[in-house]
Each structure stands twice: as structure tokens, then as C-alpha cells.
Amino acid sequence: KSGTRDSLRQIISTWRDYLSMADKLGINTNDEIVYRVKLLRQRHDELVEQLRKRERDMEAAATARKYRKIAGICRSIKPKYEYTGEVYSIVVPSGVRDIMREGDALSHCVGKSDRYWERIEQQEAYILFLRKTAEIDKPYYTLEVEPNGTIRQKRTYFDRQNDDLKDAEKFLKEWQKVVSERLTESDREKAEKSKVLRLQEFEQLRQDDIRIHTGDLAGQRLVDVLVSDLMETAA
């Protein structure tokens, strides 16, 4: 009987939670088809996802208002940095929401930190997507790239790098060569400033002895991880 009561309490709690979320989403909770819901757990979980998406959309809109240049920058760099190979491709996001979706899909920090938005807005570094050409819409690796094609970071699920990234390195070097041929003098000037800022940041991280606290890299110095990740262009 105790187990039955606990089960009933859980069902009632889930139902109340479901109705609360439905109300927040503007769904008429007085409608019988709503309050006498079938497949309660499934519908509850669907509303959780809808509410999460709406909150992220609102957050993306607020971020886009704060960093108004990002959408235009993404449009302007698209012809220069996008590249399609037989196995891999580089995709330029359309703006803030694309980048946030990427970060959510891969469960890493891109899209959750102002420093990435600031770097894009100042054209110090861009966020690009490494994708498999056959699965062009599926998040694979996220890249942070300086204006000359130097790759600062390459991260997949949970900020990791897996062995499969080694297979993509030849393509990334090929992409860097292609990009170097597309660069303007303005791009090269931006890249020089970007390099100076990167080196200054690395030196500050060394002095502060900043360590990673979570994940597979916990305990390592952040600067050592970033230096190891760096893939400078040969151009």
C-alpha cells in the first residue's frame, strides 16, 4: 500500500508539473484533452523540451540584441571560410542561435560564455563548425578560428577531442591553405592583432596558474591544453 501511495503521489506531482508547464506555454489547461492527458510522462517530457527550447530562443534573442554585429559578421565571412570536401566540411553559422544550438548539442561551453561572443564581435576569432559532409547538419566538432585560419580550439561532446579528430587533420590543413588564398590585407591585420591577444592571454593564464576543474582534463593547466590544441596556419 505504501508503494501504491508513493506511486500515486508521483503521478499527481508529474501531472501538476505538466499542467504548470502547459500554462507557461500558453496551452489551455481547462481543455479536457489537455487536463485528461494520455501518456502523461511522454507529454510531460515533451513540454519540458518545448519549455527549454523557448527559454534558449529567448536567451539567443537577448544575446543577439547585445551583440548586434554577429549576424552580419557571420554573413560576411561565409564565402571566405566555408569549404566542402569529400569527407569533411567547414560550415559558418548564421548567427547566435546556430552557435547556441551547437553548444547545446555537443554539451560544451561555446554559446554559454560572453568571451566567445566578444571575440566574434571584435573579429578576434570566429566560431565555425567542422562537419562530416555526408551528415552536414549534424554537429561534430566546434572550432574557434582566428581570421587567418589559425585554429585555436577543436572540441566535440563535453569539450573532448577523440581519436577521430586525427583523421580530419589533413582536411583542416587543406582548408587553411584554401582560406589563406582568400584573405584580404584587412584579414591579415586582424589576424596579427588576434595572435597578440592570444599570446597575452596565454601568458596571463600561466601567471595565474589557471587549472581545469571538471571533465577529462581536470587538474591540467588551461594554458597547456590551449597550446596543445593550437593549429597555426602555415601561411
Which positions does each model-derived feature cover?
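Glycine-focused motif/segment detector
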Residues: 1-235
